[in-house]
Amino acid sequence: MYDNALHIRHLGKQDYESVWHAMQHYTDNRDENSQDEIWIVEHTPVFTQGQAGKSEHILNPGDIPVIQVDRGGQVTYHGPGQLVVYPLLDIKRLKVGVRQLVTHIEQSIINMLKRYQIEAYAKADAPGVYVEERKIASLGLRIRKGCSFHGLALNVDMDMSPFQRINPCGYAGMEMIQCKQLGGPQTVEEAGAQLIETLSQELGLDKLVHHQGLPESYE
């Protein structure tokens, strides 16, 4: 039974594909009684190519796997030291439109960075969050049956060199930046704790229930 809470799942370090398939499974099997969940994870190195992605934007993947996925957007990189957050929300029940959800997610990142005196902003024509024209967070969602999956990636303290092997989000020469360079949160755990606060505030959901690991049936 839906309990009007936001269930936060702390997944730790996980490979991309197992988490992707688990969130597909969760979304496909939801009904009006399913909980709204947010999954927090750090992925092993991977390039993911969204539905709008073009192969020419993957310049030189080397030994990092490339996975074609069912989210919006183009190619991005996930790796250790990056906070990845997947909001699995019934947006119909929350009475939130898709564009509104994107705005809530972007604003929650902006509000979180503001706590560290970092001035970040969104761009109308290029989803994500930016600081001084450099990208600090990427965003790519999918809506199925009125429910969201996939989500956001915030660069915290990571090896940024793999971004040079792609045109991030399809933009040649797009410069990336991370929290550590700016005096922001120094660990994925710190960033995750802060972002859950600002994201739940943006969504108007103040009852939080924390869990460790994937739902049992999806492990």
UniProtKB/Swiss-Prot annotation:
Principal location class: cytoplasm
An example Gene Ontology CC term for this record: cytoplasm
EC code: 2.3.1.181
Residues the record lists as binding substrate: R71, G72, G73, Q74, V75, T76, Y77, H78, S138, L139, G140, G151, L152, A153
Site (Lowers pKa of active site Cys): K135
Pathway recorded for this protein: Protein modification; protein lipoylation via endogenous pathway; protein N(6)-(lipoyl)lysine from octanoyl-[acyl-carrier-protein]: step 1/2
One record GO biological process: protein modification process
Broad enzyme group: transferase
Transmembrane segments: none
A Pfam family recorded for this sequence: LplA-B_cat
One GO MF term attached to the UniProt entry: lipoyl(octanoyl) transferase activity
Catalysis performed (reactions): octanoyl-[ACP] + L-lysyl-[protein] = N(6)-octanoyl-L-lysyl-[protein] + holo-[ACP] + H(+)
Purpose: Catalyzes the transfer of endogenously produced octanoic acid from octanoyl-acyl-carrier-protein onto the lipoyl domains of lipoate-dependent enzymes. Lipoyl-ACP can also act as a substrate although octanoyl-ACP is likely to be the physiological substrate.
NCBIfam families: lipB, PRK14342.1
Protein name, per record: Octanoyltransferase
Organism expressing this protein natively: Shewanella pealeana (strain ATCC 700345 / ANG-SQ1)
Lineage: Bacteria, Pseudomonadati, Pseudomonadota, Gammaproteobacteria, Alteromonadales
